[in-house]
Regions:
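Phosphate-binding loop of NTP-binding sites
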Residues: 1-94, 98-108
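A generic structural signal for short, well-ordered alpha-helical segments in conserved domains
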Residues: 2, 162-163, 257, 261
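Beta-strand->loop->alpha-helix junctions that form or flank phosphate-binding loops
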Residues: 13-15, 107-126, 176-180, 190
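Cofactor-binding loop segments of dinucleotide-utilizing enzymes, especially the Rossmann-like FAD-
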Residues: 17, 115, 228-230, 253-255
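Short internal beta-strands
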Residues: 90-94, 226-227, 245-257
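Short, charged/polar "capping" segments at the starts of alpha-helices
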Residues: 96-101, 118-121, 233-235, 256-260
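Acidic-glycine-rich active-site phosphate/pyrophosphate-binding loop
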Residues: 124-143, 185-193
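Nucleotide phosphate-binding/pyrophosphate-handling subdomain across enzymes
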Residues: 145-247
Length: 261
């Protein structure tokens, strides 16, 4: 999102779970600037205000070691749009059952994104792999998904969500330009090095099964996955069948969930 705004000539203040905190930068934020903020469930759970534009890419079990149950986790996510007004915009994932169920609570303009179906308003991926935006004014074909530099169908979904969120603020031409140039973020399928014919990738931000599976589907080659870390008390059932080769473990979660041949 920040790259799109920067390409459009806007001054952007970026804050998220990794990197510099945004609050100390508040004195530098002018009314015409844009703040792009990634918010965790820990921050959302106590929020009583919502942003002008809210994008929820998907919801899957996570951080259940910190939340009393899955419903509390989902309710925290809902605060992203619960306090919006009629002039706000909310973008939800049509393909995710949990985010689809949030639609009835949205107060502002609702937009969808989907890689599986044509939506009535928002963005979608057609059967030829072309990204589209559709609304009351018509259906605009944007660019083939092969133009997206970073790998993985989950990144196609991310671009669909972002385009729906920024439509009207960024030109269609810039969407394609940034898609070709954006190389991704640290720790998310980040290429580290190639050694003895083996390419090493850092996907350590994939700290739940849904994100890990998305990373696995980003590659056509055979993989060796080293997984583990802190156990967040979430179900791992879906991950086992997806790991079809070797697996190694490290950290608290390694032994109980170590995959076998």
């Amino acid at each position: 999102i920040s790259k799109f705004y920067e390409a459009a000539g806007r001054k952007v203040h970026l804050g998220g779970n990794i990197g510099a905190a945004l609050l100390p930068m508040l004195p530098e934020v002018a009314p015409e600037d844009v703040a792009v903020v990634e918010l965790s469930s820990f921050q959302l759970i106590s929020m009583r205000r919502s942003p002008d534009t809210a994008l929820i890419t998907n919801v899957a079990p996570n951080h259940l070691d910190m939340h009393k149950d899955m419903q509390e986790y989902v309710d925290a996510k809902k605060n992203l749009y619960r306090h919006q007004d009629a002039f706000s915009r909310t973008v939800l994932n049509w393909d995710n059952d949990i985010t689809r169920s949030m639609a009835e609570e949205v107060r502002g303009d609702l937009y969808w994104f989907s890689r599986r179906e044509t939506v009535s308003r928002g963005t979608y991926l057609d059967t030829d792999g072309v990204l589209h935006h559709i609304d009351e004014t018509g259906d605009v074909a944007l660019f083939p998904m092969q133009e997206i530099r970073i790998p993985g169908m989950h990144n196609v979904e991310n671009f669909l969500g972002v385009i729906a969120a920024l439509w009207g603020e960024v030109s269609p031409e810039l969407f394609c330009t940034v898609a070709r140039e954006f190389a991704g973020v640290e720790h998310r399928i980040e290429f580290v090095r190639e050694l003895d014919g083996v390419k090493w990738y850092n996907d350590s931000i994939a700290s739940n099964p849904t994100r890990t599976i998305a990373g696995l589907y980003s590659f056509n080659q055979k993989l060796c996955i080293i997984a583990g870390g802190y156990d967040k008390q979430i179900p791992y059932d879906a991950l086992g069948p997806e790991i079809v080769e070797h697996g190694g473990g490290a950290g608290e979660a390694a032994d109980p969930h170590r995959p076998h041949r």
